[in-house]
Amino acid sequence: MLRMPRTRGFGVQSPTAYSFLRKVVNEKGFLRIYCQTHAGISSYPQDAPRQKRLLFRIRTVYPNVVELSASSLLKREDFQQFLWNVSDDMVLVVTDINLDAEYKKVWLRLVADNCTVLTFDLVDCGIVFFDKTKFKQNFNVNY
């Protein structure tokens, strides 16, 4: 248990998942690098909540990001309609996945769906990749 905050992706065998965890999720030097390259622009959310800072880092690395609340996928027809319109380069960030039992079911249904490939459960949000060139994997991350 003492080692959990220091693992930072070790134990993840997929190179894609490991790279995502190390370079996006657990990146601590991102603010310094961003400030050096964008000295005159102060759009990095320094005082924003942790989830917003994570979303900023994801959007910087992956251009096609969709952020949805789990409540927007509660209806089965909305859920299926969304999955029919995804592309391989899309990254989905689902917020509030553990807020309610129904939202948890939506997340588990999304993880089990054949359209999703890589899923990361970060406790307060979930991240889904749809790239069909990768193998289907699910990761629970202590973030």
Language-model features: locations:
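A short alpha-helical cap/connector motif
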Residues: 1-91, 98-143
